């Protein structure tokens, strides 16, 4: 059971199924057995776009000819949100992530750090119940990794968004997670 606003780490050796479970929750892979619930909703029967989830994976796609603002606003525009709500959410997310100054710049002109923050901002402007983060999203040099993990913790604490974070680093799992789900060979072996 995952409570609203929790920060959960999925921990285990490489290849044990952590990322696969994340992808199943996000609807990127079929749920092969069992049932996955979000609150009281059975996700197995809900289309991925209707799950109120956001994902932060290494292979995020940004539209390089759009500016940062338009990339972050895209999901809201596709859902026909009013302009004032789009403005408010994009600006709030940019402020939280420290990228307000780059909103008008084209993606192709941004640093990798800022591109990653735009991708994270795009994930949170839709106000998901849960943010799914694969460890590859934060994989980079130690200083950038620390900054990205701080951003994810701040999203969890400030916005009260539940975070499911995959890692095979035991220290990171203990440091970040309020609850740790241990996995081995595709199965949950312990929850602590």
Range-by-range predicted roles:
Residues 66-75:
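Short coil-to-helix segment of the ABC ATPase nucleotide-binding domain corresponding to the Q-loop/switch region
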Residues 26:
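Helix-to-loop junction immediately C-terminal to a conserved catalytic motif
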Residues 106-110, 114:
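Conserved ABC ATPase signature
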